[in-house]
Regions:
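A surface-exposed partner-binding patch
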Residues: 1-113, 169-231
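Generic low-polarity alpha-helical segments
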Residues: 47-50, 122, 158
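Compact, glycine/acidic-enriched structural inserts
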Residues: 113-154
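Low-complexity, serine/threonine/proline-enriched polar segments
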Residues: 150-165
């Protein structure tokens, strides 16, 4: 195994091993082709390339975080960002997504960007508070590989987490799949298991992106604060 990354003098391997020990093994792992690794080396942080090279793509956190290659998401980011001055599909790359429509994006300008397709929110702490940008590799470990799973889950009307009940009702998600609410929450749908279906992730995410005017938000307290519209 070859590793090129390090964080504060420690090999990226140590950090990746710690992530896998906490979150469990990668689910449904697939090999990343050498050409893909070459394309994204120097664009994405080294520790993510190390993960791809040595472990591949798949799902972490019991299926809550799906790692992906960014290429197929360019059209989705165009739909979300429109002509925004701070965000563009040209320098923002989807590197992971949750089962209900939360995207983890790497921006070469702002580093980690989060997109909540269900609620039309974009957050980028590296933009709203640049002092939080310290180390690219550490940022990937904290916000992607070691991501807190609850932020990718959704809750029902009784404030109960829905991912595990959704898996029990509909089965585990395969690569390229997501859970979608019908009708969509933006169209008055309710967050209930009875309203969930297993859907093609990209197709459904594009639909969600067309239903909302996205807002740049900041999470300074318990709830997001709108800063400005995206676009």
């Amino acid at each position: 195994m070859t590793y090129i990354s390090e964080i504060k003098g420690r090999s990226g391997k140590d950090h990746i091993d710690s992530v896998l020990k906490r979150s469990g093994p990668l689910i449904g792992a697939s090999v990343v082709p050498a050409a893909t690794l070459e394309t994204w080396t120097g664009v994405l942080p080294d520790i993510l390339i190390d993960f791809w090279r040595n472990h591949g793509l798949g799902a972490l956190q019991g299926g809550l975080m799906r790692l992906c290659v960014p290429d197929e998401f360019d059209g989705l980011l165009c739909e979300v960002f429109q002509a925004d001055k701070d965000f563009s599909h040209k320098d923002c790359h989807v590197i992971g997504y949750g089962p209900f429509g939360n995207l983890i994006v790497w921006s070469t300008r702002h580093w980690i960007v989060r997109i909540d397709l269900l609620h039309g929110r974009v957050s980028a702490s590296g933009l709203t508070d640049p002092s939080k940008k310290h180390n690219e590799n550490a940022s990937i470990v904290a916000h992607l590989l070691g991501h807190q799973p609850d932020s990718l889950n959704v809750v029902d009307d009784d404030d109960k987490k829905m991912f595990k009940p959704a898996v029990s009702a509909l089965g585990p998600l395969k690569t390229g799949q997501a859970f979608g609410f019908f009708p969509a929450l933006a169209m008055g749908g309710a967050p209930q298991i009875a309203n969930l279906k297993t859907v093609p992730a990209m197709e459904h995410f594009l639909l969600l992106a067309q239903l909302k005017q996205f807002q740049l938000v900041d999470y300074l307290g318990n709830s997001p604060s709108n800063l400005r519209p995206i676009g």
